[in-house]
């Protein structure tokens, strides 16, 4: 790029930031706030802090309205059957046709477009692209997550958990289990998978938290600016990291992605989107699984004791934690054609908010759904990892980390108790704890 163009680009950066925020967060916030004021459940869910802390009563209100009801931005479903149908349907996609958007929005999207400010839920992240691009990205990534590849990760996860627990042995009094364990384990495991230096983990945690915030629509301007700063730092790191692995490749997933043969090679933007998604999705969700699990088991002490006595039950326990308090609560799809769902005609372009956390408490599928029971026979029928072509590619690894992480913790600190008030993260799409004070002994 000529120097003058670079200077011009930098000079436009603040304006771009404002436009990007306005179109991605400012405008949705106006709609959602208006909806919330008129009692719209989706508006309340996404905009009301009290509902964010405890969304389950609102899900039940929605369930009473039926399996698919109108909200401020399209339709919304709390139903397991409808969510499964939509997530698996080829009449729904994750992308949206920008060419159909009003002209000012198209202009804003084009003007605000910049690789280094792109978040994990923006194209070309595989989370938000449809086939054939989705198929292409997914095929490349899923090679690293075959059952055999995940099983090979078991010693890494165990070793990482053990060394974190060794460090915890030296602590006394109340410790924050998120900071010392629940966040550390997944970030170290994903660092290993992507060959990123473990010393940078504090940066990843900071960047990941900012990236996670951008998943929620309607972010206030200041939080967006902070998030964008973190995204820029993350992209700068990725650029360096990929250049290093191009020069000196290893056996890891990123080395493989940057040295694909020409006919499969990803563009620079696609590489950034893919690695950034893996990095963020790899720990932002799993830390919630661990934190939510500890709090649930602390509240159901007899089940913690039963798992200590019979550790083979941890597989089922992790499924029940995922079901009962799902780390990802919300996703969405857009109808690509006219389609009939739950007796309703859905027209092309209609957005459906899919409440995974509500589907996982659907009484048509789960007996007494609010009861937490690690022995629940069909807990694994949950949609915590979604369904269809976007089904979580890292589900096997997440399950492994959940089982090893919680089992190892219970073995090392059998008397562990939550001590003080756990603090929820200020997020809607992801559900987990920011702080989790515990007494280890
Ligand atoms: C408890 C932990 C986790 C949960 C609850 C979770 C949940 C999810 C969900 C719900 C989706 C799909 C969203 C949708 O359908 O719109 C998803 C997609 C994805 N997850 Fe996970 N995830 C977890 C851990 C992981 C891990 C450990 C990794 C990677 C190492 C990962 C990588 C991905 C990727 C790359 C996608 C996009 C897949 C696609 O679009 O085809 N996740 N995850």
What is the predicted role of each segment?
Residues 1-441:
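Cytochrome P450
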């Amino acid at each position: 790029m000529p120097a003058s163009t670079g200077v011009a680009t930098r000079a436009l950066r603040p304006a771009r930031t404002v436009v990007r925020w306005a179109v991605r967060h400012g405008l949705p916030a106006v709609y959602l706030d208006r909806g919330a004021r008129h009692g719209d459940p989706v508006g309340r869910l996404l905009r009301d802090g009290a509902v964010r802390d405890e969304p389950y009563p609102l899900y039940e209100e929605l369930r009473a309205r039926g399996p698919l009801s109108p909200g401020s931005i399209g339709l919304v479903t709390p139903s397991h059957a409808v969510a499964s149908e939509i997530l698996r349907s080829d009449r729904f996609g994750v992308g949206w046709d920008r060419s159909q958007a009003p002209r000012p929005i198209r202009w804003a999207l084009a003007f605000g477009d910049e690789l280094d400010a792109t978040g994990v839920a923006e194209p070309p992240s595989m989370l938000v692209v449809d086939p054939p691009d989705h198929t292409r990205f997914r095929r490349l990534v899923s090679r690293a997550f075959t059952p055999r590849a995940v099983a090979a990760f078991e010693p890494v996860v165990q070793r990482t958990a053990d060394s974190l627990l060794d460090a915890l042995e030296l602590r006394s009094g109340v410790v924050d289990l998120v900071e010392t364990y629940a966040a550390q384990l997944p970030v170290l495991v994903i660092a290993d998978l992507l060959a990123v230096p473990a010393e940078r983990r504090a940066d990843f945690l900071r960047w990941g938290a900012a990236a996670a915030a951008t998943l929620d629509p309607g972010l206030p301007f200041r939080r967006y600016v902070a998030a964008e700063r973190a995204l820029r730092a993350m992209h700068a790191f990725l650029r360096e990291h990929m250049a290093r692995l191009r020069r000196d490749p290893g056996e890891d997933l990123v080395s493989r992605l940057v040295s694909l043969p020409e006919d499969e090679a990803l563009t620079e933007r696609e590489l950034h989107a893919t690695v950034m998604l893996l990095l963020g999705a790899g720990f932002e969700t799993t830390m919630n699984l661990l934190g939510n699990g500890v709090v649930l088991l602390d509240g159901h002490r007899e089940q913690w004791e039963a798992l200590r006595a019979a550790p083979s039950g941890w597989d089922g326990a992790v499924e029940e934690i995922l079901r009962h308090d799902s780390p990802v609560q919300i996703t969405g799809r857009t109808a690509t054609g006219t389609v009939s769902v739950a007796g309703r005609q859905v027209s092309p372009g209609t957005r459906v908010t899919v409440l995974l956390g509500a589907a996982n408490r659907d009484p048509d599928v789960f007996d007494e759904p609010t009861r937490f029971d690690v022995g629940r026979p069909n807990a694994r029928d949950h949609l915590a990892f979604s369904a269809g072509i976007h089904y979580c590619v890292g589900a096997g690894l997440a399950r492994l980390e959940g089982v090893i992480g919680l089992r190892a913790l219970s073995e090392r600190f059998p008397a562990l108790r939550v001590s003080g008030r756990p603090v929820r993260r200020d997020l809607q799409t992801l559900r987990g704890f920011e702080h989790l004070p515990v007494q280890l002994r």
